[in-house]
Amino acid sequence: MDAVFKALADASRRELLDRLRADNGLTLNELCARLAQAGADMTRQAVSKHLAILEEANLVVTVRRGREKLHYLNPVPIHEIAERWIGKFERSRLQALSDMKRALEKRNE
């Protein structure tokens, strides 16, 4: 899980994930073109380096199609973080809201 947090800590890598979320299954060249259209100033080598870190963290998976390598967003690690860290805190907040709703309903009776 540390690799996922490390990968998500960089704004450039988050931008790459956003691009893949919007248009999954891109080659390196297609991804670079999409980033350039969005105004991101990243070299092909930088994109390649960031993709390698995202692959290590299992946030991006690749599939070979002939000589091309397609990059896909893998949302599972992010979902696991949400379940482990965010979900735990959200449950208690939802319970507090539910308790407050019941208390207000009793008061209005």
Language-model features, listed with the residues they occupy:
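Short, intrinsically disordered or compositionally biased N-terminal tails of bacterial proteins
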Residues: M1-V4, E109
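Amphipathic alpha-helical dimerization/coiled-coil segments
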Residues: D18, A22, H79-E109
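Beta-hairpin "wing" of winged helix-turn-helix
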Residues: E55-G66, Y72
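N-terminal helix-turn-helix DNA-binding core of bacterial DNA-binding proteins
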Residues: V4-A7, A11-R44, E68-E80, R84
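Short, hydrophobic-biased segments on the C-terminal half of alpha helices
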Residues: L51-A52
